[in-house]
């Protein structure tokens, strides 16, 4: 839905640093030129994209030598009891699957944009929302991102 990119753009805007590159992870060929690396990844049908894991595994040694951070964007984080790195099931599972330990970790609630989804996606997400007591009106868009939390995360990054 583009919410991860929107969060990246907000981080860039809040940092007041004109030397920030926002790139899709599969377009990053080399991280040598960067002092800091922040990886943002969203959940789609219960999983992060495989490119996220491939990128981290390929660059783990370099990532460990740099200031680094990871943030997750998922709709489960709309719930107060699942909106921290310690309580979000996707972040917990992610950290169990990789050898990298990010120096800073954030988790942000994403967005559901029912009108933009194709038929199957719309009703699959509606069903998931129904069983988790989320919004099910398919004529609307629901943004759950706590922008104040994004701002606090950005301050912690010292970009």
Q: Where would I find each of the regions flagged by the language model?
A:
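Short, polar loop motifs at secondary-structure junctions
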Residues: 26-27
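FMN-binding flavodoxin-like domain, especially the glycine-rich phosphate-binding loop
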Residues: 12-23, 33-36, 44-159
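Redox-cofactor binding/interface segments in oxidoreductases and associated redox assembly factors
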Residues: 39
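N-terminal beta1-alpha1 ligand-phosphate binding loop
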Residues: 1-17
């Amino acid at each position: 839905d583009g919410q991860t990119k929107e969060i990246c753009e907000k981080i860039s805007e809040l940092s007041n640093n004109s030397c920030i590159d926002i790139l899709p992870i599969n377009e990053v060929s080399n991280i040598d030129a960067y002092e800091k690396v922040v990886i943002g990844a969203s959940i789609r049908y219960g999983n992060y994209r495989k490119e996220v894991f491939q990128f981290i595994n390929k660059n783990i040694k370099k990532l460990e030598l740099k200031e680094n951070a990871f943030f997750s964007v998922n709709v489960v984080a709309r719930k107060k009891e699942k909106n921290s790195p310690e309580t979000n099931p996707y972040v917990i599972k992610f950290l169990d699957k990789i050898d990298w330990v990010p120096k800073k970790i954030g988790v942000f609630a994403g967005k559901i944009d029912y009108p933009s989804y194709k038929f199957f996606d719309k009703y699959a997400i509606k069903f998931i929302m129904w069983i988790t007591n989320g919004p099910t009106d398919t004529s609307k868009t629901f943004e759950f991102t706590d922008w104040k939390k994004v701002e606090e995360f950005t301050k912690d990054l010292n970009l």
